[in-house]
UniProtKB/Swiss-Prot annotation:
Residues 1-22 form the signal peptide. Glycans are attached at residues 41, 303, 536. Part of the tectonic-like complex (also named B9 complex). The modification Omega-N-methylarginine is found at residue 486. The keyword RNA-binding does not apply. It comes from Mus musculus. Pfam families: TCTN_DUF1619. This is Tectonic-1. Keywords: Cell projection, Cilium biogenesis/degradation, Cytoplasm, Cytoskeleton, Developmental protein, Glycoprotein, Methylation, Secreted, Signal. Component of the tectonic-like complex, a complex localized at the transition zone of primary cilia and acting as a barrier that prevents diffusion of transmembrane proteins between the cilia and plasma membranes. Regulator of Hedgehog (Hh), required for both activation and inhibition of the Hh pathway in the patterning of the neural tube. During neural tube development, it is required for formation of the most ventral cell types and for full Hh pathway activation. It is found in: Cytoplasm, Cytoskeleton, Cilium basal body; Secreted.
Amino acid sequence: MGSRGLPPLLLVLLNCYTSSSTQVIAIPAAATPAVTKEDLNSTKATPTTLQPSLSPRTPGTPRAPERSGPRPTPVTDVAALCVCDLLPAQCDVNCCCDPDCSPADFSIFSACSVPVVTGDRQFCSQKAAFYSMNLTADPPHRDFKLIDQINPSVFCIHISNYKPALSFANPEVPDENNFDRLMQTSGGFTLSAESAVPSTAASDGPQPTKYEYGAPLQTAGASSGSFLKLPSPLTSSLCADQNPAAFLVSQAFECSRRVDIEQCEGMEALSMAHYSSPAILRVPNSMTQVSIKIQSVMYRSLNHTLTQLEGHGVLRPSLVSTGQDRLCSNVVLQVKYSLLYTATGQIHEAGLSLVLGTLSSAVSLLQQKFEIHFIQHGTKPVPLSGNPGYRVGLPLAAGFQPQKGSGIIQTTNRQGQFTILRSTSQQDCLASEGLRTPVLFGYNVQSGCQLRLTGTIPCGLLAQKVQDLLRGQAFPDYVAAFGNSRAQDVQDWVPVHFVTYSSNMKGSCQLPVALAIEVKWTKYGSLLNPQARIVNVTAQLVSVPEPLPGPERTVVISTAVTFVDVSAPAEAGFRAPPTINARLPFSFFFPFV
């Protein structure tokens, strides 16, 4: 009997058995016939193979991995890259990858300036173009090879076929034609004085436990908003009330405000309570509040006289009528905050100083001043003699250096850092011992006294006594070059040159009689706002032979301070005239040189 096909019922049972079975049958790859394009398009019947069908897969059976297709074509063609092609539509000398060069140009090349051109070295496999010159051939010609390079690194890029990712996209510049379309795609924009970030977003991260430099000062209460406001001018001279005060940023602003005299009682910016009512948070996002204490209130009248108000409360603007004119009193003119902070970044105390005044109906623009200063708690502010240059009439900042490389040590008494002998009505040097006067910048001073001598005082002891009288207890070694020079910045201090002058008489006792101090200073900075800077300090101690012996002798002791301006005359600065910096091409004289 010839072979017959299986009965239809048996085939159905076999299919049901294989679809419900959980056994996985591995089929060798060699037994799987290769499927070509012709097989897929063919309409001929193929012989039936007695094996389980893989198309009906149960949910628990893993899918066989699919074979990946061919690699995409790289978007970067290294054969078309040329980094030495600088001249457009011209052949660059010794640039073997220049597409503008012909075989005749290659024949006169001496070498290839760029022998290897590669793409991104982070790829696992990349093309590399090698260029070389065959100078032994006649005529010389260029050799080109394109090879594959393998990156041995484990972390490498397999393939990159997304061309837009290889360069930055040019943003579309808004104009009158595409502005509406860009507004629709971007979703528009909003301007709001308050932060649009939800309050829940701030609670996700760790809460700050201190204020950092430049952080806005947070306040409690809805009347003043979230931050302490310090009005300031923005694009114009008008006051903008949404400027937050920043931690450790001392600022001073002056701006104008449009005022309607009939509405002055209802304007918060003119009320004293608007600036004293906010409570500053000791640290950000805390429950501890620091109230603002009113330290002083000055009242300025219409004729600009100032009067300090005592025992006052919170004054509010009040509109009064005086004949045909209407006045608004208790209007805030100046606001000054003084904040004490600790080294841990906390607000310790807040003070407020105000200047109130009267506003007339003839004034439509009100000038207001706002200041804020930060002072560290537990430290006393050091008075300065200028910022940065010296101011006339302020004492010189001086001190001494205990050892080389250390900072300058100053006394806490600013008036006693650099002093000279003070003249008294008695003109007695011994009676005026210990009385000193500070050296003030810009003031030429001369002082003196009389010393009555007797024959019982030895000359050596007397000379030391007079020298101590002229120099004082602590004569400084350094003087600050600027009025705000810091003690740790030794380069900003000028040494005091102490010179002693005495007669040439041998065998005689030299008695100091005069101390001449010369301070040379110059104008530093811009001509519009020059700053006084000390450049040299010289102290000359003049000694003379002891007077002839006698029952009673009188010696005049004097001290002089002179300030000398050594500023160079101002010269106008001009820009240097332009010069021609032309260079010939590298092969200009080729082949002669």
